[in-house]
Amino acid sequence: MSEMAPRNYFEFFQLPEMFRLDQSVLDSHYLELQARVHPDKAAHLSDVEKRLSLQWATFANEAYQTLKRPLERARYLLRIHGVDTREEDNTAMPAEFLLEQIEWREEMQDAIAGRSEAALDRLGFRLKKEMDHLIESLGAMLDVQQSHPDAAVLVRQLAFLEKLKRDLDQAHALLED
């Protein structure tokens, strides 16, 4: 690998700077790069070359982890375009979205109290459908409309849903014990 750093993660994997990307292409580029820069491949190299190989492998892992997850990929794209999602200090959401969150959390608590995995499964199905819809909308906003401020709102909503998904996964684990 050359010592010249790529401009961004998309360039590193030779991918277009877009939200919608072919996961199989990302995976194959990642595996190809890992095969070339993995520290085990550098055992015969000088200390400087080993360190450089480790840096490239670390960069490849970080880039891959960011681009393979829709929420992280959207955040990264917005950052490239100078848009701060302000997730830490801007929790303003449409009232309908917030009411839905409250309703879903209440459903989850009821399912836990009733030890109903079926109710958790139904909630998980609806949550996945909503997340898929948001991801599709993000693709349109980022790739077609290039409406970055509006996309930042969707990123904040998707972050809420991902948190709910983690909580739902924990609820499933709780019922399995």
From Swiss-Prot:
Gene3D superfamilies: DnaJ domain (1.10.287.110), HscB, C-terminal domain (1.20.1280.20). Keywords: Chaperone. GO terms for cellular component: iron-sulfur cluster transfer complex. It comes from the Bacteria. SUPFAM superfamilies: Chaperone J-domain (SSF46565), HSC20 (HSCB), C-terminal oligomerisation domain (SSF47144). One of its GO terms (biological process) is [2Fe-2S] cluster assembly. CDD domains: DnaJ. Residues 8-82 form the J domain. The keyword DNA-binding does not apply. One of its GO terms (molecular function) is ATPase activator activity. PROSITE patterns: DNAJ_2. HAMAP family: HscB (MF_00682). Co-chaperone involved in the maturation of iron-sulfur cluster-containing proteins. Seems to help targeting proteins to be folded toward HscA. Belongs to the HscB family. Interacts with HscA and stimulates its ATPase activity. This is Co-chaperone protein HscB homolog. It comes from Methylococcus capsulatus (strain ATCC 33009 / NCIMB 11132 / Bath).
